[in-house]
């Protein structure tokens, strides 16, 4: 949205576009990458780390075994306007086999856990990337998003909170969309300042369709 506004409504030289959304005003910035492509970044609104769940509770809902889930960090709900569950997995094989079962999820939904599930692991398709992920959500059945900005933002807060990396400042490349044949790359920057998570999510814009109203 911000890229379209900058290209067609605002000045193309604008360094920042601010989007007024339900969660508040979201700043979006633009920068050139090393390969001369343009990266678009949004700054996440404040996030809340909520209730946690167990591998035993979640494994069946994803068609996995308990041994597929990385129990070094909890399964946790993260919120910023919308909410999603962050689920750490041990392997890319487990990631590929993941599939959200809404019937099995009904008990968790009754406990207040949203049927929006972001699964990730440390194994990647390409060595220059850091994590691989999938995002499932309910929409007349189960759908899968090929690139999820808010999911990546939630992940950033989660990784900082649980000290998944030794540094308090993160710069991470996340693969997504391979299972739906739309491979995507999502960039994540995150840092802690006191008790506050500062998270930005970026990616390349690739125009695919253009129309004209007559």
Which positions does each model-derived feature cover?
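Active-site proximal loop and beta-alpha junction motif in alpha/beta enzyme cores
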Residues: 1-214
């Amino acid at each position: 949205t911000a890229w379209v506004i900058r290209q067609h409504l605002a000045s193309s030289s604008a360094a920042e576009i601010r989007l007024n959304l339900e969660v508040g005003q979201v700043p979006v910035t633009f920068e050139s990458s090393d390969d001369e492509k343009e990266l678009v970044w949004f700054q996440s609104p404040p996030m809340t780390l909520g209730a946690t769940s167990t591998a035993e509770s979640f494994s069946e809902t994803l068609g996995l075994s308990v041994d597929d889930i990385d129990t070094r960090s909890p399964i946790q709900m993260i919120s910023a306007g919308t909410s999603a569950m962050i689920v750490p997995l041990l392997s890319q094989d487990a990631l590929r086999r993941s599939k959200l079962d809404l019937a099995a999820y009904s008990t968790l939904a009754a406990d207040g856990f949203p049927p929006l599930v972001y699964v990730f692991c440390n194994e990647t398709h390409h060595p220059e990337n850091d994590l691989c992920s999938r995002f499932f959500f309910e929409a007349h059945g189960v759908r899968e998003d090929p690139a999820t900005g808010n999911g990546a933002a939630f992940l950033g807060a989660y990784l900082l909170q649980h000290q998944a990396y030794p540094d308090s400042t993160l710069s991470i490349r996340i693969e997504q969309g391979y299972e739906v044949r739309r491979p995507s790359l999502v960039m994540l920057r995150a840092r802690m300042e006191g008790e506050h998570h500062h998270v930005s999510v970026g990616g390349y814009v690739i125009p695919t369709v253009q129309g004209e109203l007559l």
